[in-house]
Amino acid sequence: MSALQKYPRISDMVMPAARRLPAFVHAYLAAGTGQGQAMARNEAAYADIHLMPRFLRGRVTPDTHCSVFGKTYSAPFGVSPIGLQSLIWPGAEKILCRAAAEAGIPYTLSTVAGEDVETIGPISDGHGWFQLYAPNDHGVMRDLLARAKQAGFTTLVLTADVPGPSRREDMRLAGAPIGSRNPMSITPRVFWQCITHPAWSFAVLANGGKFRFKNLEPYSSESALENITDYIGSQLNGSLTWDYLDEIRK
């Protein structure tokens, strides 16, 4: 049975994913912030989009291609950025990027992804977009953008609406150590979720057993997750202004 036959709708994948992933990981993937009102409004807005059919036009071959920023893609959507996708499944950045390149749609790599631009850029086959959380240090910002461009990313996605750490209440309820210096601290509850989801746990161990923010490691004195987390907290604190945007354009 093909994946399309098994999961004909996106909603059909929700429950299998919930069974396969530890609860704190699934909450990170599937839930929004706070009580989830913004996420619910977004889903309602997408559900309110209607396709208007046109009849009596003879034989027509549907064409979903579209042009964005001077480049043509096979469909009017792409893969949005998710930080630390490798937490959800080891190697997820590579898996999704290859799938997007094969489908001819954009793949957007997050600043705080588990893989770096140098790894993902060549896989994207010219379809790579890079999402930037603007660092306070302009030198780091310029170097990140230079690395992304050198790696083959063609489009910049600048995130402006995250002024600070979000309230991930579903993750807190699922047992994730929210507020800890090391967000991957192994609490008894997290440990139990890991051993009761062996497929995910073995995949993580086979991938080295570590979660990393590889794009940002060159700018921190140590690569340990807790130090990178401290660095992210000090550098990515929502201080974006129009002057900063002008600096990016230069």
Model-predicted segments: where are they?
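Hydrophobic faces of well-ordered beta-strands that scaffold small-molecule active sites
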Residues: 77-80, 107-109, 128-132, 156
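Alpha/beta enzyme core
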Residues: 84, 97-98, 102, 119-123, ...
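Active-site microenvironments in enzyme catalytic cores
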Residues: 65-66, 76, 80-81, 113
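A structural motif shared across PLP-dependent enzymes of the aminotransferase-like
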Residues: 34-37, 87-93
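Short glycine-enriched loops at secondary-structure junctions
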Residues: 83-85, 110-116
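A structural-propensity feature for long, helix-poor, extended segments
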Residues: 117, 124-133
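An N-cap/entry alpha-helix motif that binds or orients negatively charged groups
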Residues: 1-70, 179-182, 186-240
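A short, Lys/Arg-enriched amphipathic alpha-helix followed by its capping loop at the start of a domain
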Residues: 75-77, 96-105
